[in-house]
Structure formats: C-alpha cells, structure tokens
Amino acid sequence: MSDTSYKLGITKTFPCNYLPDQQERLLIAVDERLHNSESYGWLMTQGFRRSGDQSYRPSCPNCNACQSIRVLTSDFLPSKSQKRSKKRNSHFIIKQSSQLKDSYYPLFENYINTLHQDGSMYPASFQQFESFLSCNLTQQLFIETWAPANEENGPKEDKLVCVAVTDVLSNGLSAVYTFYHPDYKANGLGVFSILTQLSLSQQMSLPYLYLGYQIDECQKMNYKDRYFPFERFIDGQWLINTKPSVNKAKIAK
C-alpha cells in the first residue's frame, strides 16, 4: 500500500485537550479506499487511531508530543506493580462479546460523568457512546470484567464493572477505550484491562498491542510506556524501547 497515493484531509487548529497553550490539528483519512479492514490495519502501522469509523493522526503545527505506542506482546514482561494488579484482580470474571451492547451505556455514562467531568466527552450521551465506540472498519472485541456474586461485601449477582473496547487487526489488537465503574477505581482496572488485552494478544499469536498516543507531558496520557518492550512511532519509524528509564522504573515499582 505504500506505493499508492491516498486523499487525506486536515482539520483547522483548535485548543489541545491535553496540553495547555498548545494547538491541535488532525490528519483525517477521507479517501474511501481507506475505509476497510486492510487499510485500517495499515493506517495503524502509520501512527493513526480511530474515533468511530474515522481514522486520524495528530498533525499539529508546533508540537509532536503525541506518539503512537505498541507493545511487543510475545516479549512482554510485567513489572512488579503489573503482577500485583493481576493478582489483586484475579477474582474477576472475564467475558468477551463481539457486539457493542446497549447495556454497556449506563456504565459508560457513570464513568464519564463521575471521573471525567473535565473532559471533552462530558456530559455523556448515548449518541456519543455509539458513534465513538462502534466501528465498521474491522472486527471488534468487547472485553467485559465482572465482579462475581456472593463475595464478602460484593454484589448479590454478577456485576459488570469494566469494558475494554478492542479492535482486532491482522498484526495485533488495538486498545480503543476502557471504561469502568467508579466504585472500582482503586482496583486499577485500566491497567488490568491492558494486561488482559496483552494476554489475549498472546493467545491469538498477534505480535502487537496498540495502546494509542503516549503524551509524556500529560499525566493522564503518559502511562502507556510502562509496558515493555514497546515500539514508539517517531518521524515515520517504529523505534524499540526495551528498558524503562530511571524515573519510569521508580513509577513501576
């Protein structure tokens, strides 16, 4: 596909949602030939992401802080804190669905309206839920985490506490979005969901888990380089990183 030319669009600049005093601009895959599973997978290798069926990549005039990251699944080694996360959450029941269920919406709404009141998706709406998470470009998996019934201080019946929206590509899985019940925030279900996606990637013999954009200067977007080894998309190349820096090593303990 690299020898073919495609039509791309570019947005106007607008205030960045992640870095104050920065202006954001997006490159959009508008060519109809890119609106299929094979092309979407190729776009992911070029640093793109998706929102609904729209594939995009940051193309900001004065900033290149957003850098796509993918974990090398076969070589992944969990840190001590990631091992603790797996142990702490080992009682949960994991299920999978291939469909975006309407029954997920109350959980999504609670997550957005409780934990992300400062975000661009607040307040949550069902239309936003559908348009953002559904996708016709590729196969999807919805990884469900359930709290089992009859535990001490637990629910009276199995309770859905987290959904990890995941795209299936020819060379990996892509972590699109994860939302969870605010009462379970202390469980670190975001980390646990990534670990579950990594395990599933390994089971499916897929070499990569795409985690989205790492933004070092943004606290809520700088966690994605804690899963080693990973590759980071910089200046059109995937550059491998196998060891944490001193600061990251301290965070991972």
Curated annotation (Swiss-Prot):
GO terms for biological process: ubiquitin-dependent protein catabolic process via the N-end rule pathway. Its main location: cytoplasm. GO terms for cellular component: cytoplasm. The keyword Transferase applies. GO terms for molecular function: arginyl-tRNA--protein transferase activity; leucyl-tRNA--protein transferase activity. The gene is bpt. It comes from Colwellia psychrerythraea (strain 34H / ATCC BAA-681) (Vibrio psychroerythus). Its EC number is 2.3.2.29. Signal peptide: none annotated. This is Aspartate/glutamate leucyltransferase. InterPro entries: Acyl_CoA_acyltransferase, Asp_Glu_LeuTrfase, N-end_Aminoacyl_Trfase, N-end_Aminoacyl_Trfase_C, N-end_Aminoacyl_Trfase_N. It is found in: Cytoplasm. It catalyses: N-terminal L-glutamyl-[protein] + L-leucyl-tRNA(Leu) = N-terminal L-leucyl-L-glutamyl-[protein] + tRNA(Leu) + H(+); N-terminal L-aspartyl-[protein] + L-leucyl-tRNA(Leu) = N-terminal L-leucyl-L-aspartyl-[protein] + tRNA(Leu) + H(+). It is an enzyme of class 2 (transferase). The keyword Transferase applies. Keywords: Acyltransferase, Cytoplasm, Transferase. Belongs to the R-transferase family. Bpt subfamily. Pfam families: ATE_C, ATE_N. NCBIfam families: PRK01305.1-3, PRK01305.2-2, PRK01305.2-3. Functions in the N-end rule pathway of protein degradation where it conjugates Leu from its aminoacyl-tRNA to the N-termini of proteins containing an N-terminal aspartate or glutamate.
